A protein has these predicted regions:
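C-terminal or internal capping secondary-structure element at the end of a domain, subdomain, or sheet
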Residues: 141-155
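Acidic (Asp/Glu-rich) sequence patches and key acidic residues
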Residues: 1-139, 155
Length: 155
């Protein structure tokens, strides 16, 4: 049996660096900024949770693992889906060896530009910091440093 490692690189945040627990009310405010995601989450709540959701854990784990686009990542996954829908920017959710979750904007190859929105083609570092801040401030008052990340994992 072999063991492989991989690295993800990009500019972004480690959502596990947040110290305060995210409240369900704030998390739902974040989800509501993306109408299609909100409908998916609402369907999950109605069908899988009998119309009630009691903890952020239900969304971070159960929803993300069963219905999320990347199926892991907790808050990073929710932010990924919101930003993808609202801002039309494709980010990457990644997890390191220690289970820490990241949301990053990876380096882009020139031949992928034809698939990008005009907004993404003209994205600046400042724009990216503002986007992360905009959506993080819906769920927390904490500041996360947006910086270059090197994420290593394996399996």
């Amino acid at each position: 049996m072999s063991y492989n490692t991989w690295h993800d690189y990009g500019y972004g945040i480690c959502t596990d660096d947040l110290k305060e627990e995210i409240s369900l009310v704030k998390l739902m405010k974040l989800v509501q900024t993306a109408p299609k995601l909100y409908e998916k989450v609402k369907k999950f709540i109605d069908e899988d949770c009998d119309g009630q959701i009691m903890e952020t854990y239900d969304l971070f784990d159960t929803y993300v693992e069963e219905y999320g686009e990347v199926n892991y990542g907790g808050l990073a996954e929710i932010l990924y889906e919101v930003i993808k829908e609202v801002e039309n920017i494709e980010l990457l959710v990644s997890t390191d060896f220690n289970g820490k979750e990241y949301l990053i904007y990876p380096p882009i190859y020139p031949w992928t530009l034809e698939k990008m929105s005009d907004k993404e083609k003209n994205l600046t570092e400042k724009d990216l910091v503002e986007i992360f801040s905009k959506y993080l401030h819906i769920v927390t008052n904490e500041e996360l440093t947006v910086e270059y990340q090197s994420i290593e994992n394996g399996g």
